[in-house]
C-alpha cells in the first residue's frame, strides 16, 4: 500500500501512472490518500477527509492521465454513443438518481483496456473522461462536493481502476459488482412478475385515459399474452395539456375512473397485474397541496413544467409521499408503482436550506434524503405486499436505485429501435438481477407486420413493454405481437437469465447473444456479418433487414434463408 498524507494535496503512483487528489478551500480539513490493491488485482484509490469541526466539505478533485493505448471508445450506462471525446467535451455527473459512476475504455474487439468506478453512488459526482490533445492521453477526473453539500466532519470513499485487458462486458459487470460490495448495497427482491410482458398506456393514450377504454384494450392485451399494465399520467386529472400542474393531490379523476378499486379488480380478473404512475417530486402549481408545502421545495418550477419540487429533507414531506403510496396500495389493491422523475430532486442554484440553517430538516444532504425517502417507500410497500413491483426509468438506474426498484426501464425513445436495443444491453450489463425493460414500443400500422417486428426483436433481450393501440391494430400486427410474446416466454430463461454477451458497443451492439444450458439465442441487427453459431441448439432472431444471412458453424460457412422480422432454429 502506498500512502501520502498532506493538508491540501496528495499523490500516489499506480500501474498506469500518477493519480493526484487535491482539495480547495480546505479550511481545517485534512486529506489522506492511499493506493490499495483489491483481491481481484484492480487498483483502489482510497480518499479520506477529516475535520475537527462539522463543516461544508471542500471541493475535492482526483485526476490522472493514462496513455491512450488500445482505448478507441468510451462507455457509460447512459451514453448515446461510444465515441471518444476531448477532455473539454467529456464531462458528466452522477448521483443517486442520475447515471452510474462506471466508465470503460475499450477497443473495436470488445476488449477493455481501462475502467474507472467510484464507490460514491448517492452524492453528486462530476466526471471527466476524455482525450487530452497534448500527448494523446486519456484524462480522468472525478470531483466531489462541487454542488451544494451539507456539513460533515468525516468522509471516506474509494475509486477503482482496472488497467488490465479483459472482455468489455466483464469489465462493466466487475466494476458494478465492486460498487455494490464496497458501498454495501443490497438489491431488492425481483419477483417473477417483474419479467412479464407489459402494456403501458403512455404513448398511445397519453393523459386521455378512461377506465372503460383501458379495460377494452387490456382484454386484447391479455389474449396476446401480456401480464402487467401501467396506467401512466392522466388518471389523477381531467386536464390533458401535458405538464404537471395538477400533480400532487393524487386524487382519482372520477370522470375517468368512477370506481378505481373496481376498475383495478376487473383488470386483475383478466390475469393482468396493475401498476400506477406517480411523479414523485412534483407538486403542481395548480394543485390543492401546493400551498400546504410552501417553503418545503428545492425548486419552485422545475424546467417550466408547472410543478414545484418537494424537499425530502423535511420528514413531513417524506411521510406525505410514503403515506400517498401506501394509501393507494391499500385502497385499490394495486400490484406496483411507476415512480417517475426522481432525478428532479435537485437544486436550481443555491441550496435554500443554508440561509435557513436547515430549519425543519432532519437530513442536511439532498441526495442522502432522496436515498432515505426511496428506502422508506420500499420498506413501507414491501411490508404490505412483499412482491410489490417498482419501476424506475433511465437515467436513474445507478447501483443505489436497485435497493428500491426491481424494474429498470430504458429512457423515452419512441420509434427509435436502435436506441432501445443499445440501452437495454447497457442496462443488462450494469443492473445485475433487476428486470430490464424496453421503452414502450409503438409503430405505425401502415408498416408491414414483418417490419413492425423489428421493433420487437430489437427489444427482446429485455422485458418488452408495448404501447400501441391494440383495438386499432390490423389483425396481422396482433398476430405478430402474439407470436413474439410466445417466443419470449418459451425462451424466457435464456433471454433474460442466460449468459448475456452483447458485441461491439461502438456499433450499438449489432449482434447480441444469450446462452443457457439448453440453447443459444442470437439477435442479428445488421447485415453483412458472419454469425458464429455454436453446435448447441441455436435460434437466430433476424432484424438485419435482409432475408438471409451468413453463419459459421464448425468451421464451415454457409448462407441461411430467414425473413427479416422472423426467427429460425439452427
Predicted regions and their residues:
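N-terminal accessory beta-strand-rich subdomains and adjacent acidic, glycine-rich linkers
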Residues: 12-178, 533-537, 545
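Short, acidic/polar
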Residues: 208-223, 317-330, 452
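Active-site-proximal substrate-binding groove within the catalytic cores of carbohydrate-active enzymes
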Residues: 145-156, 373-570
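Sec-dependent N-terminal signal peptides
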Residues: 1-10
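Residues within well-ordered alpha-helices
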Residues: 217, 260-263, 455
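Active-site mouth loops of central-metabolism enzymes
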Residues: 200-212, 306-320, 441-448
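Aromatic- and carboxylate-enriched substrate-binding clefts and catalytic-loop regions
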Residues: 230-440, 477
Amino acid at each position: 500500500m502506498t500512502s501520502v498524507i498532506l493538508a491540501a494535496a496528495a499523490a500516489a503512483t499506480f500501474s498506469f501512472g500518477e493519480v493526484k487528489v487535491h482539495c480547495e478551500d480546505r479550511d481545517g480539513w485534512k486529506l489522506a490518500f492511499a493506493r490499495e490493491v483489491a483481491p481481484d488485482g484492480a487498483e483502489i484509490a482510497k480518499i479520506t477527509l477529516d475535520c475537527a469541526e462539522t463543516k461544508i466539505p471542500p471541493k475535492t478533485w482526483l485526476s490522472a492521465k493514462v496513455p491512450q493505448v488500445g482505448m478507441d471508445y468510451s462507455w457509460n450506462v447512459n451514453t448515446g454513443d461510444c465515441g471518444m471525446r476531448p477532455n473539454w467535451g467529456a464531462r458528466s455527473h452522477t448521483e443517486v438518481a442520475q447515471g452510474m459512476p462506471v466508465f470503460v475504455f475499450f477497443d473495436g474487439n470488445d476488449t477493455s483496456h481501462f475502467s474507472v468506478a467510484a464507490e460514491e453512488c448517492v452524492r453528486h459526482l462530476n466526471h471527466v473522461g476524455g482525450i487530452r490533445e497534448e500527448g494523446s492521453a486519456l484524462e480522468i477526473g472525478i470531483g466531489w462536493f462541487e454542488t451544494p453539500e451539507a456539513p460533515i466532519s468525516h468522509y471516506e470513499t474509494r475509486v477503482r481502476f482496472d488497467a488490465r485487458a479483459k472482455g468489455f462486458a466483464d469489465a462493466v459487470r466487475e466494476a458494478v459488482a465492486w460498487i455494490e460490495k464496497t458501498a454495501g448495497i443490497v438489491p431488492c427482491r425481483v419477483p417473477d412478475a417483474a419479467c412479464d410482458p407489459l402494456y403501458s398506456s403512455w404513448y398511445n393514450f397519453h393523459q386521455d385515459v378512461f377506465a372503460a377504454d383501458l379495460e377494452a384494450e387490456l382484454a386484447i392485451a391479455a389474449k396476446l399474452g401480456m401480464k402487467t399494465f401501467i396506467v401512466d399520467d392522466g388518471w389523477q386529472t381531467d386536464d390533458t395539456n401535458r405538464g404537471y400542474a395538477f400533480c400532487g393531490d393524487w386524487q382519482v379523476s372520477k370522470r375517468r375512473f368512477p370506481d378505481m378499486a373496481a376498475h383495478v379488480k376487473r383488470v386483475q380478473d383478466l390475469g393482468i397485474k396493475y401498476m400506477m404512475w406517480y411523479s414523485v417530486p412534483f407538486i403542481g402549481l395548480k394543485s390543492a397541496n401546493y400551498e400546504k408545502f410552501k417553503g418545503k421545495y428545492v425548486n419552485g418550477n422545475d424546467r417550466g413544467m408547472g410543478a414545484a419540487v418537494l424537499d425530502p429533507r423535511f420528514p413531513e414531506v417524506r411521510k406525505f409521499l410514503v403515506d400517498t403510496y401506501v394509501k393507494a396500495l391499500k385502497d385499490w389493491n394495486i400490484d406496483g408503482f411507476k415512480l417517475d422523475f426522481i432525478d428532479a430532486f435537485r437544486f436550481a442554484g443555491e441550496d435554500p436550506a443554508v440561509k435557513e440553517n436547515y430549519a425543519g430538516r432532519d437530513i442536511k444532504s439532498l441526495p442522502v434524503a432522496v436515498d432515505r425517502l426511496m428506502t422508506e417507500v420500499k420498506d413501507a410497500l414491501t411490508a404490505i405486499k412483499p412482491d410489490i413491483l417498482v419501476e424506475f426509468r433511465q437515467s436513474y438506474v445507478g447501483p443505489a436505485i436497485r435497493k428500491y426498484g426491481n424494474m429498470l426501464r430504458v429512457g423515452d425513445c419512441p420509434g427509435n429501435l436502435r436506441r432501445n436495443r443499445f440501452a437495454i444491453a447497457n442496462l443488462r450489463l450494469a443492473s445485475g438481477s433487476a428486470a430490464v425493460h424496453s421503452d414502450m414500443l409503438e409503430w405505425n400500422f401502415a408498416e408491414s407486420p414483418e417490419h413492425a417486428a423489428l421493433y420487437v426483436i430489437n427489444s427482446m433481450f429485455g422485458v418488452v413493454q408495448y404501447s400501441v393501440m391494440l383495438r386499432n391494430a390490423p389483425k396481422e400486427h396482433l398476430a405478430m405481437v402474439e407470436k413474439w410474446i410466445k417466443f419470449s416466454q418459451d425462451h424466457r430463461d435464456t433471454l433474460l437469465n442466460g449468459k448475456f454477451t452483447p458485441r461491439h458497443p461502438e456499433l450499438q451492439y449489432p449482434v447480441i447473444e444469450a446462452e443457457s444450458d439448453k440453447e443459444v439465442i442470437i439477435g442479428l441487427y445488421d447485415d453483412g456479418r458472419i454469425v458464429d453459431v455454436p453446435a448447441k441448439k441455436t435460434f437466430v432472431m433476424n432484424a438485419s433487414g435482409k432475408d438471409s444471412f451468413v453463419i459459421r458453424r464448425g468451421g464451415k460457412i454457409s448462407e441461411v434463408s430467414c425473413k427479416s422480422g422472423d426467427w429460425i432454429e439452427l
